[in-house]
Design a protein with these regions (language model features):
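Metal-dependent phosphoesterase signature
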Residues: 66-83, 90
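Acidic catalytic cores of enzymes that act on phosphate-bearing nucleotides/polynucleotides
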Residues: 198, 209-289
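C-terminal non-catalytic accessory extensions
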Residues: 422-474
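Short strand->helix junction
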Residues: 18-20, 73, 179
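Metal-dependent phosphoesterase core characteristic of DEDDh/y 3'-5' exonuclease domains
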Residues: 25-28, 34-35, 40-68, 89-201, ...
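Long, charge-rich C-terminal accessory regions
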Residues: 252-429
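Entry/capping segment at the start of metal-dependent catalytic domains
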Residues: 1-40
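Short secondary-structure capping/turn segments at boundaries of alpha-helices and beta-strands
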Residues: 16-20, 47, 86-87, 244-247
Length: 474
């Protein structure tokens, strides 16, 4: 079958990780299943583990959640270079839509960083060869807000609707016995996709077709400030993660971001304050604002599959159910249209946004910039070179990050290729990571959790494993 004829497929996937930071923590386990466009499973389930390198210790809290120890990952896993290659092979099958649950904010960032550390293009998998990505978390939020019929919506302890995968599966009678095992979460995500597709087929098809930025662009009319309904976790569960918004302007530097006003908010700051005061207030944490109204502005990134729809998609009875005051939103829209000078103010907020302070650590430098075509081509040569021949590889890179990435890549994945001077350099790097201060606070955290889980033999065994692992590698 030629690429052009490749049937569209969904690749449902999930990572379990050794910590919450996509760049500085490491993956533990990856799972994926390919389905056809009706969500029938068509491929073998893929599950593999990643061996942690010897310059990293897992976050204890993450191991408490996943139950995966570094010893288990080391025993069952492949090195990160091989781990990245396997994932890249799955993700780059033409016409694949890579889908997960909260993947836009988390798993996709893990993928980008794994690919960045291992010389694969961090972005191409999600757009080349008619590929795309999609996130079921916002689909569930949209379904609850816009068309809730046909699905049971569980509540959390605070009485708010819960969108945690394990809560939704339980409420809807879906088998999900081993939450936080990557494969169990993948099966659960497929089941949720089927549930929404069957309960609300029109909404489902609409959201699926509007996952691309090209399609979303057709909804956004900045000159008219055309109102839209927008679903986002940023709005908070207390109003169903939903509001009516209007586009004020495109972001001055990021062509994938549109500056939206939350019409349900208090727009007085936009009218009364200058751009410097607005910027300061926008970047002040909510809990420090006191009685001051927040700036009701948010960026919507059209390359992150945001949920946007025509304003009338939010029916009056659903707006009432979510506690959204339609008249207040309409009044705000009228005022904003009468005060177009607000547009320049909000553009000015973002034209001099918070400065991006680059990290000294190359692992955290993915977003410092794109690699040139020449560097990309050179990185492909690295991937095609036998590990044992890497030391003799004579290529120069323009981007300063790549030499450091290359050294880390060899030291973490192929330590046998380091000469004596390089081994000393790596040892020094590990000493810089595992300072006495770091190790003391790590031991303290393990002790604190150990007493917290008194009487829980399973959790305490995990903590003992972490303590042993730290002693082994440091």
């Amino acid at each position: 079958m030629s690429d052009s004829a490749a049937r569209p497929t969904f690749l449902f996937h999930d990572y379990e990780t050794f910590g919450t930071h996509p760049a500085l923590d490491r993956p533990a386990q990856f799972a994926a299943i390919r389905t056809d466009d009706e969500f029938n499973i068509i491929g073998e389930p893929e599950v593999f583990y990643c061996k942690p390198a010897d310059d990293y210790l897992p976050q204890p809290g993450a191991v408490m959640v996943t139950g995966i120890t570094p010893q288990e990952a080391r025993e069952k896993g492949v090195n990160e270079a091989e781990f990245a290659r396997r994932i890249h092979d799955l993700f780059t099958v033409p016409n694949t839509c890579v889908v997960g649950y909260n993947n836009i904010r988390f798993d996709d960032e893990v993928t980008r960083n794994v690919f960045y550390r291992n010389f694969y293009d961090p972005y191409a998998w999600s757009w080349q060869n008619r590929n795309s990505r999609w996130d079921l978390l916002d689909i569930m939020r949209a379904c609850y807000a816009l068309r809730p019929e046909g699905i049971n919506w569980p509540e959390n302890e605070e009485g708010l609707t819960s969108f945690r995968l394990e809560h939704l599966t339980r409420a809807n009678g879906i088998e999900h016995s081993n939450a936080h095992d990557a494969m169990a979460d993948v099966y659960a995500t497929i089941a949720m996709a089927k549930l929404v597709k069957n309960a609300q087929p029109r909404l489902f098809e609409y959201l699926l077709s509007h996952r691309s930025k090209q399609k979303l662009m057709t909804l956004i009319d900045v000159p008219q400030m055309k109102p839209l309904v927008h679903i986002s976790g940023m709005f908070g569960a207390w109003r169903g993660n939903t509001s009516w918004v209007a586009p004020l302007a495109w972001h001055p530097d990021n062509r994938n971001a549109v500056i939206m006003v939350d019409l349900a908010g208090d727009i007085s700051p936009l009218l009364e304050l200058d751009s410097d005061s607005l910027r300061e207030r926008l970047y002040t944490p909510k809990n420090e604002l006191g009685d001051l109204p927040a700036v009701p502005v948010k960026l919507v990134h059209i390359n992150k599959c945001p949920v946007l729809a025509q304003a009338n998609t939010l029916r009056p009875e659903d707006a009432d159910r979510l506690g959204i005051n339609r008249q207040h939103c309409l009044d705000n829209l009228k005022v904003l249209r009468e005060n177009p000078q607000v547009r320049e103010k909000v553009v000015a907020i973002f034209a001099e946004a918070e400065p991006f302070v680059p990290s000294e650590n190359v692992d955290a430098q993915l977003y410092n910039g794109f690699f040139s075509d020449a560097d990309r081509a050179a990185m492909n040569i690295v991937l095609q070179t036998e590990p044992r021949n890497l030391p003799a590889l004579d290529i120069t890179f323009a981007d300063k990050r790549i030499e450091k990435l290359m050294f880390n890549y060899r030291a973490r994945n192929f330590p046998g290729t380091l000469d004596e001077a390089e081994q000393d350099r790596w040892l020094q790097h590990r000493r810089n990571v595992f300072t006495q201060e770091f190790l003391n606070s790590y031991a303290q955290e393990l002790e604190m959790l150990y007493s917290q889980y008194e009487g829980n033999a399973e959790k305490q065994a995990l903590l003992k494993s972490l303590f042993q692992y730290a002693q082994e590698i440091v």
